[in-house]
A protein has these predicted regions:
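Iron-associated oxidoreductase/ferritin-like identity signal
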Residues: 2-182
């Protein structure tokens, strides 16, 4: 049918135009940023799994905290994808490994999240170092907001971990603290 043929033809022309202008990843910074996209998507999925865990524990405040973080990590991946596209680089969505779905109680997911944020911080800092060392000023400028974000994330999860690890902390107390602080 002519309509289907026209759509296929237009899509092929658009892809050919994009391929003409979009280059493959061409620097260490861009390669690391591509990897970071994958890590942000893994983070999003991991926080979604944690949100489900808290939902199963009937902890709506904690459920919302981790659902919000899942959305935020996905947004970070999209910002990185758009940055690469704006730089004329064709990003690819990497394979995303499975995430952990089983946790014990209400402390373990927060501990895992805090450790994960520390790991993400190390990756973001490496991106900043590589951008600076290669005089990639736009890359350094772009990644700076993520450095600031990581300071906030680590501080937040550190405080949350202190609350959930407090001896005798109850679900009610944790939920109330989260409701007040968020």
């Amino acid at each position: 049918d002519i309509y289907k043929y026209s759509l296929t033809f237009l899509a092929e022309r658009r892809n050919a135009r994009l391929d003409k202008y979009m280059t493959k990843i061409n620097s260490e910074f861009h390669k690391l940023l591509q990897e970071q996209i994958g890590l942000e998507l893994v983070s999003s999925n991991q926080y979604l799994a944690m949100s489900i865990h808290y939902d199963n524990l009937d902890m709506p405040q904690m459920t919302d905290v981790f659902k919000g973080h899942a959305d935020e990590e996905y947004d970070h991946a999209m910002q990185m994808i758009h940055y690469l596209q704006d730089a004329g680089i064709k990003p690819e969505v990497p394979e995303i490994p499975a995430v952990r779905n089983d946790f014990d109680g209400f402390v373990e997911p927060v501990r895992v999240a805090f450790e994960h944020e520390q790991f993400v911080t190390s990756k973001i800092e490496k991106l900043a170092r590589v951008a600076r060392d290669s005089y990639d000023f736009s890359g350094e400028s772009f990644i700076t907001k993520f450095i600031d974000e990581q300071v906030e994330e680590e501080a937040y999860f550190s405080r949350l971990l202190a609350i959930v690890e407090e001896e005798g902390a109850t679900v009610f107390e944790i939920e109330n603290w989260v409701a007040r602080e968020i």
